Amino acid sequence: MRILKPYLRSTSIQCYLCLLLNSHFLTEAGIHVFILGCISAGLPKTEANWQYVINDLKTIEHLIQSIHMDATLYTEGDAHPNCKVTAMQCFLLELRVILHESKNAAIYEIIENLTMLANSNLSSIENKTELGCKECEELEEKSIKEFLKSFVHIVKMFINTS
């Protein structure tokens, strides 16, 4: 099972630093080092790996087939490369529909992990306005299978530009 919070993977370094500096906490410099170490433990250490997102989408597809879910979701079929962030945000919102419709613990865990991974990578992209992109509600409603296929296509657009 992957760690749900990849940015906490390197916290052991800060723990060792704290142990090393334990005798120096009585000084002002030691306290500053301790505080900075604690702050850095909470900062993101790695970017989301889009390949994990694709693997999670394939797992969701398999799980949905086993529970025979047939909802329709707003799906971006042919997103322009300049609209990929907007399209990704729509896909992430529609994942919540799958979550609500399935009421499956395994799907819940995978969607939470996938959302966290994707959002951590999206947060590193500049906040630029994507003009001319469709709103989520303007997209065509398609089956879950088509939704997941299009979602993988959008993720691959992010892989190809990184």
Curated annotation (Swiss-Prot):
Q: Where in the cell is it found?
A: Secreted
Keyword NAD in annotation = no
For this chain, one GO molecular function annotation is:
cytokine activity
Q: Which residues are glycosylated?
A: N113, N121, N127
Tell me the SUPFAM superfamilies matching this sequence: 4-helical cytokines (SSF47266)
Signal sequence region: 1-29
Give the protein's recorded name: Interleukin-15
Source taxonomy: Eukaryota, Metazoa, Chordata, Craniata, Vertebrata
